Amino acid sequence: MAALGSSSQNVTEYVVRVPKNTAKRYNIMAFNAADKVNFATWNQARLERDLSNKKIYQEEEMPESGAGSEFNRKLREEARRKKYGIVLKEFRPEDQPWLLRVNGKSGRKFKGIKKGGVTENTAYYIFTQCADGAFEAFPVQNWYNFTPLARHRTLTAEEAEEEWERRNKVLNHFSIMQQRRLKDQDQDEDEEEKEKRSRKKPSELRIHDLEDDLEMSSDASDASGEEGSRASKAKKKAPVTKAGRKKKKKKGSDDEAFEDSDDGDFEGQEVDYMSDGSSSSPDEAEGKPKVPQQEDGPKGVDEQSESSEESEEEKPPEEDKEEEEEKKAPTPQEKKRRKDSSDDSDSSEESDIDSETSSALFMAKKKTPPKRERKPSGGSSKGTSRPGTPSAEAASTSSTLRAAASKLEQGKRTSETPAAKRLRMDTGPQSLSGKSTPSSGDVQVTEDAVRRYLTRKPMTTKDLLKKFQTKKTGLSSEQTVNVLAQILKRLNPERKMIGDKMHFSLKE
């Protein structure tokens, strides 16, 4: 208790007076300690309001009456603000920042920004001691934080944008140089890898892409594609060629006794001649379409190409036999025919083809006179009906020779033979679409199909091979690749690199 009494004796009491009505308003100026502000060094100080934002709060001055005025503009403007909830802030000079200049123009500058919300939940007072020892407390109205202003000149918006662009250029330049260095390093590494590969043994396993194989096969097909296909097809069709040779021997034996033969000697061998697909009948030469047999199966693209190649291989021995027979018994009609064919061959390639077909037809008529007998009996098909009585034209070989020679002289044969060729080419797909049509899912690798796919959109070789699958075409993968390579060479499509892959396309 004594301690408490002694402590209470040491307490000093002060009188604090709070004035009710004060004309003065007190504000606090807060400086950052890092700015190292020393009031003792201040010889001169000037404080003023920054009223530069007054233009922002100002409204456009419009005349209320007279020229350029609007009727009830203020009312309509207020209605618009209420509609959109726009609240205008009044320009209050008390809320504007302070500008403090110390020691004239050469001194420092500070800008004091009002700190809001300081006096909302707290009350600050400034105590001043009077002469009688009492304190007067004055409430703080506002709080301002003063920060020093930069002395150097700042950039405008346009200048800052220009500097930013220059900075981007500099950074881009550095990045470009860095990319070049990286590229050079990559090239050096690639060269080193190539040298290492060249030093390695050549007997290494190499995996090729399907597109590379197709391009390689298309390049090699010029020299060895046809020979390889002929060799493989000759192996497959070995029994067929043997049968063809037997038929040729039979024909040769028949031709030897042709001069002494009578009208009915060839009736037993008619079926052999009618079943022969390589020789062209007079019905085809005269333009009548050939009715397919029911026994014939559906022919694919490879079978058609094989039959055409076999017919090309069979042509030279037939021509040799024709030359031997012409040497034995040359007639004036044949001499005239030879002259016409030689003139046509000198004129153009088409006339060569026409003369060859006409000579082949001519010799076919010479060899098989009973075929003329089948025309009046209505046996245009390869059917089994026997011929009726022989016509007057088939009485002797001289009549057929004269008729053929007269047709050659008139020039009808030259116009009919290309039509017969077209009929033979056209009847092939017709026979496929007729009795011996393949199933609806079968697909043939044709030039029209490839052209149709390439005109739609650019495709790679993989896409084309997917379109022509082995299950649908009936061909092996090697045959499909070879056929596609030949078709692409003929079409010669445009080549584009899309995503590191070669794409082929055609324009309509």
UniProtKB/Swiss-Prot annotation:
Locations listed in the record: Nucleus
Predominant place of localization: nucleus
Basic residues bias (residue ranges): 232-251, 364-374
Compositional bias ranges of the Polar residues kind: 378-388, 428-443
GO biological process, one term: transcription elongation by RNA polymerase II
Species classification: Eukaryota, Metazoa, Chordata, Craniata, Vertebrata
Role according to the record: TFIIF is a general transcription initiation factor that binds to RNA polymerase II and helps to recruit it to the initiation complex in collaboration with TFIIB. It promotes transcription elongation.
Pfam families the record matches: TFIIF_alpha
Residue numbers bearing the Phosphoserine modification: 217-218, 221, 224, 377, 380-381, 385, 391, 431, 433, 436, 440
InterPro entries for the chain: TFIIF-alpha, TFIIF_interaction, WH-like_DNA-bd_sf, WH_DNA-bd_sf
Cellular component, GO annotation: cell junction; nucleus; protein-containing complex; transcription factor TFIID complex; transcription factor TFIIF complex
Keyword DNA-binding: yes
Family, as annotated: Belongs to the TFIIF alpha subunit family.
Residues where N-acetylalanine is found: 2
Domain of life the protein comes from: Eukaryota
Residue positions where N6-acetyllysine is found in the record: 407
The name this protein goes by in its record: General transcription factor IIF subunit 1
Organism: Rattus norvegicus (Rat)
Alphabetized UniProt keyword annotations: Acetylation, DNA-binding, Nucleus, Phosphoprotein, Transcription, Transcription regulation
Record field: compositional bias (Acidic residues): 255-270, 303-325, 343-355
Assembly with partners or alone: Heterodimer of an alpha and a beta subunit. Interacts with GTF2F2, CTDP1, TAF6/TAFII80 and URI1. Interacts with GTF2B (via C-terminus and preferentially via acetylated form); this interaction prevents binding of GTF2B to GTF2F2.
GO MF annotation list: DNA binding; phosphatase activator activity; promoter-specific chromatin binding; protein domain specific binding; protein phosphatase binding; RNA polymerase II general transcription initiation factor activity; RNA polymerase II general transcription initiation factor binding; TFIIF-class transcription factor complex binding
PTM characteristics: Phosphorylated on Ser and other residues by TAF1 and casein kinase II-like kinases.
Low complexity: compositionally biased ranges: 389-406
Chain positions covered by the region annotation Disordered: 177-448
Chain positions found as Phosphothreonine: 156, 331, 389, 437
